Amino acid sequence: ILRRVHDALEAVDMLDYAKSAPHMLSGGQKQRIAIAGMLAIEPQVLVLDEATAMLDPLGRKDILRIVKDLNRKKGITVIMITQYMEEAVIADRVIVMNEGLVAFEGTPAEVFRRGTELRKINLDVPPMVELRDDLAASGIIKPCNAMTVEEMANELCPLLLKI
């Protein structure tokens, strides 16, 4: 079991804090320790409910990186419940719930094409999706599926090089 705990702490970059008092850790560090606790039991599926709530942007980014790594490198299925639509961008599949029912589902690209419907149920689209849609509506870029800063940069850089 010590080996599994060691490996779990290493997976979430918290090995250096193994002997730290919990009250001395930041919110993001506590979340990573909680995830490590789940990893130590070697689950096939990990369910995270608002895992990034009340974290600063850097803490949120760290948790999302860890979640992505768990899925891609360790093959763990991660079910992530979140109210932050920009977090859903990293998912393979998104299920949008409204009043306890499935409103719609699909890939992030499919779901975020439905910005008007998302807003009707009081959900936002990720900022890059909103920027993308505004730029496309203004004719500045062609309609595309860019959802992250990197993807948007890939769309905009060729245009800037033409100027």
Please describe what each predicted stretch is.
Residues 2-17:
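Conserved ABC ATPase "signature" region
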Residues 21-25, 29:
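Conserved ABC ATPase signature
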Residues 35:
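Hydrophobic anchor residue at the start of the ABC signature
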Residues 42:
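Conserved catalytic motifs of ABC-family nucleotide-binding domains
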Residues 46-49:
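Catalytic Walker B motif of ABC-type/P-loop ATPase nucleotide-binding domains
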Residues 105-106:
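ABC ATPase "signature
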